Swiss-Prot record:
EC number: 4.2.1.9
Pfam family, one: ILVD_EDD_N
Cofactor, how bound (note): Binds 1 [2Fe-2S] cluster per subunit. This cluster acts as a Lewis acid cofactor.
Family matches, as PANTHER family: DIHYDROXY-ACID DEHYDRATASE DAD, DIHYDROXY-ACID DEHYDRATASE, MITOCHONDRIAL
InterPro entries listed in its UniProt record: DHAD_IlvD/Edd (IPR050165), Dihydro-acid_dehy_C (IPR042096), DihydroxyA_deHydtase (IPR004404), DiOHA_6PGluconate_deHydtase_CS (IPR020558), ILV_EDD_C (IPR056740), ILV_EDD_N (IPR000581), IlvD/EDD_N (IPR037237)
Top-level EC class: lyase
Protein name in UniProt: Dihydroxy-acid dehydratase
Amino-acid positions noted as binding Mg(2+) in the UniProt annotation, renumbered to this chain: 83, 125-126, 448
Subunit composition and interactions: Homodimer.
Length: 561
C-alpha cells in the first residue's frame, strides 16, 4: 500500500474524528479505506453540451486506477460553461469567469475535505485551464486528464467540424448557400460527445497539458469515444499516487521551462490565442514570472509545423492516428526548441520521456511537417504592440494568409452591434471592424467574437477585412483578427478613442498595430473621454469586473503569489 496518507489524517484519524468517518461510511467507506490515501477525482461534468457529457464515466475509470495503486477515490464535480452554446449571447460573459470559478471551487472542495492527491478531468475550453490553475494553486500531487475530442463529422467526402457550422451561417447570410445546406451542415458537424474537433481552444489546452508536463504523455489526442481514453483514465489514477510517492507536485512541474515548452508548442501548432491568457494565468498561480515579452521572443523563432484546423485542413483525430501530441513534441525536442529538463507528473523529465517515445510506423500525411520545411515559416501567433495596444494584443497569424493590413475603422461598442452590421452587409473590403467595451472589465468577462468572425469569413471577407477587439476570439477563428487589446476600452485604453474613418495599420511580421492619427489628436480625444458606467451593480459579473486584471496579465482575479 502507498504510504502517503498525511494530510487527510487530520480529517479522518483519531477518536475526535469519529463523526467525520461516519459521513464517509455512509458513502461506502470500509474500515480499511481509512488507512489509504484519499484521492479526489474532479469531474467537470454537465449535460448542457457534449464536451463534458462523459466525464463522470471517466471518473469511474480513474477511481479504478487509484484503487489498483492502493488509494481510495471520491468523485466531486465542478461547474461547466459551454462556450460554443453561449457564443454571441449574454451567456458568453460567463465563459472566462468560469475558469477562475472552477479553480476556486476545486480549492474550496479539496482543501475543505483534506484530500491527499487528486486527478482533474476537464473537457471544454475553460474547465481545462481552471483545473490546471487549481493544480498549481493547491500544490498537492495531481494529474490532469482530458475528456477527449469529439469525432469529426462527414458530408460526403468533406470532413466537418463545428467551425463549418459557424462559418456556414455567414455563408447563408451572404446568399452563398441555401437554408437546407446550412441545416445539413448543422446536423452532421458534431456527431459524438467530446470537445470541438479542430485545434481550437479545448484541444489546444489539452495539447499544452502534455507540453506543461501536467498530463500523461500521449493522453491528449485519443477521441472521447475511444477505449484508449478510458485506459488513460485508469493510468492517470495510478500515476497520481506514483507522483505522491515521488513527491512530485505541480509547482515542481510548472516552472519557467514548462511554460516555455508550452509556448513553443502553442506557436508551432497555430493553437488558440486563448492559450496565451491561460498560460499567463497558470504561471501566475505557480508564481512564475512569464510575460507577453517572453511569448513575443519565442514566437519570433518558432515556425508552424502542424496543419490542424483552423490553420490547416485536419482535425485532432487525424493527429491522433499518427501518434498524437508526442509526435509534435519530439519534433520540437529534436530541433532544440524544447527545454528537456522540465519535470513532468510522471516523475521524469520531458526530455527523457520523449527520448523513449517512438512514433507509430504511419506516414504523417501532410498533417505534420518538419521544422526545416514547416507548414508555415512563421509562428502561429504574434504579439502586437503599438499606440493602439500599448500593453499588448495578440494576432493569430497562423490561420491568416495575410500578415499585413491597413484599413478604415468601423467602430462598434459591442459584439451585437458588429454582428448586425455584418449580417446587413455593411462591412466592406478594406474595413477594420473595431469591437470595444468587450474586455475583462468592460463586458465584463471578455467574451469571444466567433459569431462575428465566422460570419465575416463565411461571407467571403476573411482576408478583405480585419477585426480588432479588446475581447477574445474562439480557437476556431481564422482571418485577420487582433484580440486581447490592452488596456481595454473600459479603463480608458486607446481602443476607446478610435473613431469611424480612422486609419489602422496591422503588421503581423513586425508585431505592430498603429492608430494612424497624430498624438495631439489622441490626447484631445482622451481628455474628452468619460468612462462608461458599470454594466452590472451586483452579482457575479459585478464582482468579477471589480477584481479582474487586464488581458496582458492573464485576466486573473487573485493576487500574485
Amino acid at each position: 500500500m502507498v504510504k502517503i496518507k498525511v494530510r487527510s489524517s487530520a480529517w479522518y484519524d483519531g477518536v475526535d474524528n469519529a463523526s467525520h468517518r461516519s459521513y464517509l461510511r455512509a458513502v461506502g467507506f470500509t474500515e480499511e479505506d481509512f488507512a489509504k490515501p484519499l484521492v479526489g477525482v474532479l469531474a467537470a461534468w454537465s449535460e448542457l453540451g457534449p464536451c463534458n457529457y462523459h466525464t463522470l464515466d471517466l471518473a469511474r475509470y480513474v477511481k479504478e486506477g487509484v484503487k489498483e495503486a492502493g488509494g481510495v477515490g471520491l468523485t466531486a464535480p465542478t461547474i461547466v460553461v459551454n462556450d460554443g452554446i453561449n457564443m454571441g449571447t449574454p451567456g458568453m460573459r460567463y465563459s472566462l469567469i468560469s475558469r477562475d470559478l472552477i479553480a476556486d471551487t476545486i480549492e474550496a472542495q479539496f482543501n475543505a475535505h483534506g484530500v491527499d492527491a487528486w486527478v482533474g478531468i476537464g473537457g471544454c475550453d475553460k474547465t481545462q485551464p481552471g483545473i490546471m490553475m487549481a493544480m498549481v494553486r493547491l500544490d498537492l500531487p495531481a494529474v490532469y486528464l482530458y475528456g477527449g475530442t469529439a469525432e469529426a463529422g462527414w458530408l460526403g467526402e468533406r470532413e466537418l467540424t463545428i467551425e463549418d457550422t459557424f462559418e456556414a451561417v455567414g455563408s447563408y447570410l451572404a446568399g452563398k448557400i441555401t437554408l437546407e445546406e446550412l441545416k445539413r451542415i448543422e446536423e452532421l458537424s458534431f456527431p459524438t460527445y467530446g470537445t470541438c474537433q479542430g485545434l481550437f481552444t479545448a484541444n489546444t489546452m489539452a495539447m499544452l497539458s502534455e507540453a506543461l508536463g501536467l498530463a500523461l504523455l500521449g493522453s491528449a489526442s485519443p477521441p472521447a469515444t475511444s477505449a484508449r481514453r478510458r485506459a488513460y483514465a485508469v493510468a492517470s489514477g495510478r500515476a497520481v499516487l506514483k507522483a505522491a510517492e515521488l513527491g512530485v507536485t505541480p509547482r515542481r512541474v510548472v516552472t519557467y521551462d514548462a511554460i516555455y515548452n508550452a509556448a513553443v508548442t502553442l506557436f508551432a501548432t497555430a493553437g488558440s490565442t486563448n492559450a496565451i491568457l491561460h498560460l499567463l494565468a497558470i504561471a501566475h498561480e505557480a508564481g512564475v514570472k512569464f510575460t507577453l515579452d517572453d511569448f513575443d521572443e519565442i514566437s519570433r523563432r518558432v515556425p508552424v509545423i502542424a496543419a490542424l484546423r483552423p490553420a490547416g485542413p485536419y482535425a485532432m483525430q487525424d493527429l491522433d492516428r499518427i501518434g498524437g501530441v508526442p509526435r509534435i513534441l519530439k519534433k520540437l525536442y529534436k530541433a532544440g526548441f524544447l527545454r528537456p529538463e522540465a519535470l513532468t507528473v510522471e516523475g521524469e523529465t520531458i526530455g527523457k520521456l520523449l527520448e523513449r517515445w517512438q512514433p507509430p510506423a504511419v506516414p504523417e500525411d501532410g498533417i505534420l511537417y518538419s521544422v526545416e520545411k514547416p507548414y508555415k515559416p512563421y509562428s502561429g501567433i504574434r504579439i502586437l504592440r503599438g499606440n493602439l495596444a500599448p500593453d499588448g494584443a495578440v494576432m493569430k497569424i497562423g490561420a491568416a494568409d495575410k500578415l499585413k493590413f491597413e484599413g478604415t475603422a468601423k467602430v462598434y461598442n459591442g459584439e451585437a452591434e458588429a454582428f448586425k452590421a455584418v449580417a446587413a452587409g455593411e462591412i466592406k473590403p478594406g474595413d477594420v471592424v473595431v469591437i470595444r467595451y468587450e474586455g475583462p472589465k468592460g463586458a465584463p468577462g471578455m467574451p469571444e467574437m466567433l459569431k462575428v468572425t465566422a460570419a465575416i469569413v463565411g461571407a467571403g471577407l476573411g482576408e478583405a477585412v480585419a477585426l480588432v477587439t479588446d475581447g477574445r476570439f474562439s480557437g476556431a477563428t481564422r482571418g485577420i483578427m487582433v484580440g486581447h487589446v490592452a488596456p481595454e476600452a473600459a479603463v480608458g485604453g486607446p481602443i476607446a478613442l478610435v473613431e469611424n474613418g480612422d486609419k489602422i495599420a496591422i503588421d503581423g511580421e513586425t508585431g505592430r498595430i498603429t492608430l494612424q492619427i497624430p498624438q495631439e489628436e489622441l490626447e484631445r480625444r482622451r481628455k474628452n473621454w468619460t468612462p462608461p458606467p458599470p454594466k452590472y451593480s451586483g452579482g457575479l459579473l459585478a464582482k468579477y469586473a471589480a477584481l479582474v486584471q487586464q488581458a496582458d496579465k492573464g485576466a486573473v482575479t487573485t493576487p500574485p503569489r
